[in-house]
């Protein structure tokens, strides 16, 4: 019996005395089950201890993996995973392998921030209908609320530096977020005259994302996040892209802070190879040097290096600031490229840029 790819989960470590009907009842707690198939031994006719459960949609499939994996069934804990032909399986394993070391280094930091900064949308159980058993909100609900909050922040004339974080935690009680005065003290101004360079609320293309200095505020916000919080944010955004790609595209275009923050989070989690990023930016810079200057746009400039001092402490600070400035310049150059600039590049370089931009959002 064939099953629909993307709607199937692998279930392992099943007790041998459990029937398909019992397993169906268990998985019905997550959502309607289309079919459950135990793999049987052809000689004995008994179960081999694993099987496959098919749902009616991929969203319920992902929810089953999150909610039922390692749940107890008799004396055992069942394994609920994406099958080997589902790209989400490899993505999930890649996150685990690449973040273990980072998370170990952030344990002390995480203990002090988890209670304050985890967005309630990550663990809300009231966003889904009762028939689906609650759990993680659907991508449509998550993306719509995020877009609404981000649009409110971008439309204001003076936007707090922590707008991106505040937009994801708008339902928090302000009393649960100490020290917010220090955060809100750093602000950046949104110049309404820059609207002729791109509409930040209507969903049209952004011709000059760097017209608003998002970099400092986004970097400051993400520096307060633990590894688990960064991973949750990226996983949520990936779910939106996987389930509702068109809605995700409109969300990212309408809110330039969101893709920038996601890309910066990928850098912090070491999900982007710095050497590849450097090669792409250098190639783009060399390509732009051989093209006539455009009347409507110009390639972003690289910040000048901070002059060195005779004092060792000043030299150390200058080196750190210089490295941070270089990294921010690389990110800004990559994100500021217009579709025309990307299409003008040779195919190899163009594919490399698009691959870096989409390597997390596209499977």
Curated annotation (Swiss-Prot):
Subunit and partners: Interacts with res2.
Q: What GO terms are given for molecular function?
A: mRNA binding
Domain RRM: from-to ranges: 7-85
> Where is the region Disordered?
291-325
GO BP terms in the entry: co-transcriptional mRNA 3'-end processing, cleavage and polyadenylation pathway
- Keywords for this protein: mRNA processing, Nucleus, RNA-binding
Q: InterPro entries, from UniProt? A: CSTF2_hinge, CSTF_C, CSTF_C_sf, Nucleotide-bd_a/b_plait_sf, RBD_domain_sf, RRM_dom
Q: What does this protein do?
A: Component of the cleavage factor I (CF I) involved in pre-mRNA 3'-end processing.
| One GO location term (cellular component) | mRNA cleavage stimulating factor complex
Cited PANTHER family: CLEAVAGE STIMULATION FACTOR SUBUNIT 2
Where in the sequence does UniProt note compositional bias of the Polar residues kind?
A: 306-322
One Pfam family it belongs to: CSTF_C
What protein am I looking at? Cleavage and termination factor 1
Cellular location of this protein? Nucleus
Gene name per UniProt:
ctf1
């Amino acid at each position: 019996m064939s099953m629909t790819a993307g709607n199937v989960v692998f279930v392992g470590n099943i007790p041998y005395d459990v029937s398909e009907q019992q397993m169906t009842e268990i998985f019905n707690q997550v959502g309607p089950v289309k079919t459950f198939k135990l793999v049987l031994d052809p000689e004995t006719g008994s179960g081999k201890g694993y099987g496959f459960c098919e749902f009616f949609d991929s969203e319920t499939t992902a929810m089953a993996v999150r909610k039922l994996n390692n749940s107890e069934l008799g004396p055992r804990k069942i394994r609920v995973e994406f099958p080997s032909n589902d790209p989400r399986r490899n993505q999930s394993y890649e996150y685990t392998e690449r973040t273990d070391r980072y998370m170990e280094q952030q344990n002390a930091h995480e203990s002090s921030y988890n209670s304050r900064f985890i967005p309630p949308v990550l663990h809300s159980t009231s966003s889904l209908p009762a028939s689906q058993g609650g759990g993680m909100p659907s991508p449509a609900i998550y993306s719509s609320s995020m877009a609404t909050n981000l649009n409110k922040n971008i439309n204001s004339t003076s936007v707090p530096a922590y707008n991106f974080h505040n937009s994801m935690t708008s339902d928090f009680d302000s009393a649960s977020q100490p020290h917010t005065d220090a955060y809100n003290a750093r602000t950046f101004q949104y110049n309404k005259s820059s609207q002729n360079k791109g509409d930040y609320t209507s969903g049209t293309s952004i011709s000059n994302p760097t017209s608003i200095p998002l970099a400092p505020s986004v970097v400051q916000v993400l520096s307060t996040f633990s590894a688990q919080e960064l991973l949750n944010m990226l996983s949520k955004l990936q779910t939106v892209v996987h389930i509702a790609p068109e809605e995700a595209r409109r969300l990212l275009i309408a809110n330039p802070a969101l893709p920038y923050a996601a890309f910066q989070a990928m850098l912090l989690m070491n999900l982007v190879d710095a050497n590849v990023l450097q090669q792409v930016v250098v190639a783009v810079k060399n390509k732009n040097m051989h093209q006539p200057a455009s009347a409507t746009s110009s390639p972003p400039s690289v910040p000048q290096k901070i002059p060195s001092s005779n004092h060792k402490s000043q030299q150390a600070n200058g080196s750190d600031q210089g490295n941070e400035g270089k990294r921010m310049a690389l990110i800004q150059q990559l994100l500021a490229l217009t579709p025309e600039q990307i299409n003008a590049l040779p195919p190899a370089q163009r594919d490399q840029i698009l691959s870096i931009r989409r390597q997390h959002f596209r499977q």
